[in-house]
Design a protein with these regions (language model features):
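An extended, acidic
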Residues: 166-225
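Active-site glycine-rich loop that binds ribose-phosphate moieties when present
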Residues: 123, 162-163
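N-terminal subdomain of lithium-sensitive/metallo-dependent phosphomonoesterases centered on the IMPase/IPPase/PAP
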Residues: 1-106, 190-194
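Residue-level signal for inorganic ion chemistry
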Residues: 24, 28, 58, 69, ...
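DPxDG-like acidic metal-binding loop motif
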Residues: 94-157
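Residue-level detector of flexible, active-site-proximal loop/helix-junction positions
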Residues: 87, 151, 159, 184, ...
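Short glycine-/acidic-enriched loop or helix-start segments at secondary-structure transitions
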Residues: 91-92, 112-113, 188-189, 212
Length: 225
């Protein structure tokens, strides 16, 4: 049994992370609309790396989430590992706590810039490198997927709940595979063609892909990287 740090209640923790996640949703939706309305998408880019772009939205969500967690849980013995902070200073990352928050403020940045809606925020509280609490926010669908390591559920901003709707299929040829829109390599393409899946759905963000499986819209995701 995993015991949270003293002073941390799991139910209050989930409620706080839900609140922070919807705040992140507001930021992401705001910048998604700015991109949609703008003729110059480079205005919100903070780098020129086409393979790994970073936007103002990434950085604002990153800053807000870290600030909220830090200020709401002062003196708690855990650390926060953020993808954006690793990019900024990869040589200054030292993790030596049992409890570690892992944050990706914007997964699917290319899709975010392209305006497909297939982007997400990922947040997890790990205990000794295993996920204890996980959240995947998909702003475009008003979805927040949550697991408390026992149960998985989805809720919207109005706290309306839905359960996973997994499809049970045994034959690969009857399955719909969900795959990357921007990062599919030739090895995976060859595998898809050889198996001859019933349908191939392309989308960004691993969180969006897994959510599509949980909704019952697809059946399988394969990552070869």
């Amino acid at each position: 049994m995993i015991i949270l740090p003293p002073g941390v209640d799991i139910n209050n923790l989930i409620d706080d992370m839900k609140s922070f996640s919807w705040e992140a949703s507001d930021i992401l939706i705001k910048y998604a609309q700015i991109i949609k309305d703008s003729n110059n998408k480079s205005n919100i880019l903070t780098n020129k790396n086409e393979e790994d772009p970073v936007t103002i939205a990434d950085l604002q969500v990153n800053e807000m989430m870290i600030k909220n967690i830090t200020e709401s849980y002062k003196n708690i013995n855990w650390e926060i590992l953020s993808e954006e902070n690793v990019k900024i200073d990869p040589n200054n990352i030292r993790i030596n706590k049992d409890f570690v928050w892992v944050l990706d403020p914007l997964d699917g940045t290319k899709d975010f810039i392209q305006g497909t809606g297939n982007y997400a925020m990922h947040l997890a509280l790990n205990y000794k490198n295993k996920c204890y609490l996980g959240l995947v926010l998909i702003p475009d669908k008003d979805e927040l997927w949550i697991t408390n390591h026992d149960t998985i559920w989805c809720e919207n901003r109005n706290e309306e709940y839905t359960k996973p709707n997994l499809r049970i299929k045994n034959n690969l040829k009857d399955m719909t595979i969900v795959t990357s829109k921007n990062h599919r390599n030739q090895t995976l393409q060859n595998l898809i063609e050889k198996v001859d899946f019933k349908e191939v759905i392309e989308m960004g963000s691993i969180g969006c892909k897994i959510a599509s499986i949980l909704r019952g819209e697809s059946d399988i995701y394969i990552c070869l990287s």
